[in-house]
Curated annotation (Swiss-Prot):
It catalyses: (2R,3S)-3-isopropylmalate = (2S)-2-isopropylmalate. The gene is leuD. GO terms for molecular function: 3-isopropylmalate dehydratase activity. Keywords: Amino-acid biosynthesis, Branched-chain amino acid biosynthesis, Leucine biosynthesis, Lyase. One of its GO terms (cellular component) is 3-isopropylmalate dehydratase complex. One of its GO terms (biological process) is L-leucine biosynthetic process. InterPro entries: 3-IsopropMal_deHydase_ssu (IPR004431), Aconitase/3IPM_dehydase_swvl (IPR015928), AconitaseA/IPMdHydase_ssu_swvl (IPR000573), IPMI_Swivel (IPR033940), LeuD (IPR050075). This is 3-isopropylmalate dehydratase small subunit. Its EC number is 4.2.1.33. Pathway: Amino-acid biosynthesis; L-leucine biosynthesis; L-leucine from 3-methyl-2-oxobutanoate: step 2/4. It is an enzyme of class 4 (lyase). It comes from Shewanella sp. (strain W3-18-1).
């Protein structure tokens, strides 16, 4: 998993509340079990005017030329609600997004994002609105997300602090998923297993 320390990237916004996981990645695209290849289906029903995904919707923000290559998504409250599917953060990450900024997130989506290297940043409604206004006002507007200091820097230079559980912050800073976190304690695990063998003999 790629470590997340500080990232500056082009920002895109979807000014909608209660974006659920079926909107993020519709159920008909969930047959794959590997993490790659989901980005093309991200927000399928909004990005495309046809079921096959051949006709892009020019009104949808992710299809607009000014947002091409965006790596930070700004959205509204309760992002990632709905059914639990790890495919949702997979699709967002595969599309090229590194961080999602919103006033609140669904709990399961929040945890799945952290476990897959996607940083969910919760800011106040007013701060999110300011970010959206600045992104809309300036083509090419970039946002910086600094996980080392837990700050978001807006295109105009305004700084907003956010919080993240230290365990989640540690995993993201070091690029550790659940397996990687376990392997980081390999020496202690080996020592414990040796002790267990001694007790059993």
């Amino acid at each position: 998993m790629q470590p997340f320390t500080t990232h500056t990237g082009l920002a895109v916004m979807i000014d909608s509340t209660n974006i659920d996981t079926d909107q993020i990645i519709p159920k008909q695209f969930l047959s794959k079990v590997t993490r790659d290849g989901f980005g093309v289906h991200l927000f399928h029903d909004w990005r495309y005017l046809d079921d096959a995904g051949d006709v892009p919707n020019p009104e949808f923000s992710l299809n607009q030329p000014r947002y091409k290559g965006a790596s930070i998504l700004v959205s509204q409250e309760n992002f990632g609600c709905g059914s639990s599917r790890e495919h949702a953060p997979w699709a967002l990450a595969d599309f090229g997004l590194r961080a999602i900024i919103a006033p609140s997130f669904a709990d399961i989506f929040y945890g799945n994002s952290i476990n897959n290297g996607l940083l969910p940043v919760a800011l106040t409604h007013a701060q999110v609105r300011q970010l959206m206004d600045e992104v809309a006002a300036e083509e090419g507007a970039q946002i910086t997300v600094d996980l080392t200091s837990c700050k978001v820097i807006s295109p105009s230079g305004a700084e907003f602090s956010f919080t993240l559980a230290e365990s989640a912050r540690h995993k993201l800073l070091n690029g550790l998923d659940a397996i990687g976190l376990t392997l980081s304690h390999a020496a202690q695990i080996s020592q414990y297993e040796t002790q267990i063998q001694g007790w059993r003999s």
